[in-house]
Amino acid sequence: MALRLEDKQAIVAEVNEAAKGALSAVVADSRGVTVGEMTGLRKAAREAGVYIRVVRNTLVKRAVEGTDFECLNETFTGPTLIAFSNEHPGAAARLLKDFAADQEKFAIKAAAFEGELIPAADIDRLAKLPTYDEAIAQLMMTMKEASAGKLVRTLAALRDQKEEAA
């Protein structure tokens, strides 16, 4: 069924709004994936704070104009599924990477983060970014280890001073 001009403009505006507020984007080819599997993916995406949309290539090209995701224009060929991460930069990449592992027909084309194109082969770089909470936990662990090491060195220095004095 053909879309009217107003419908196309609404789609472009909706995707453009999603792109403006997104931290990263992932483009995939969803040919061969059943409706039930796509419904499961969409549900998981909503829970992860990821906006997913299957959009015509010409419309998605217009939607990403003037955003950090303009670098993805070359990947908009064939059936295009675009996913925008709204809460965490690696959320969409992680979600689609896990989905692609289960679905052999589902293929990730590329991703974009801060205006940089990330090829499908390097999608792990984006998918393995720690979440905010994970990053804070890692920082706290580093600080905790550093302070424990400092304490040990201080106690050793104190012991050495007392031994020299004796």
Curated annotation (Swiss-Prot):
GO molecular function: large ribosomal subunit rRNA binding; structural constituent of ribosome
GO cellular component terms attached to this protein's record: large ribosomal subunit
Gene3D superfamilies from the UniProt entry: 3.30.70.1730, 6.10.250.2350
Keywords: Ribonucleoprotein, Ribosomal protein, RNA-binding, rRNA-binding
Stretches that traverse the bilayer: none
InterPro entries to which the protein is assigned, alphabetical: Ribosomal_uL10 (IPR001790), Ribosomal_uL10-like_sf (IPR043141), Ribosomal_uL10_bac (IPR022973), Ribosomal_uL10_bac_type (IPR047865), Ribosomal_uL10_CS_bac (IPR002363)
UniProt xrefs under PROSITE patterns: RIBOSOMAL_L10 (PS01109)
Nucleotide-binding is among the record's keywords: no
PANTHER family reported in the protein's UniProt record: 39S RIBOSOMAL PROTEIN L10, MITOCHONDRIAL
Function of the protein: Forms part of the ribosomal stalk, playing a central role in the interaction of the ribosome with GTP-bound translation factors.
Similarity remark: Belongs to the universal ribosomal protein uL10 family.
HAMAP family documented for this protein: Ribosomal_uL10
NCBIfam families assigned: PRK00099.1-1 (NF000955)
Subunit structure: Part of the ribosomal stalk of the 50S ribosomal subunit. The N-terminus interacts with L11 and the large rRNA to form the base of the stalk. The C-terminus forms an elongated spine to which L12 dimers bind in a sequential fashion forming a multimeric L10(L12)X complex.
Protein's name according to its UniProt entry: Large ribosomal subunit protein uL10
Primary gene name: rplJ
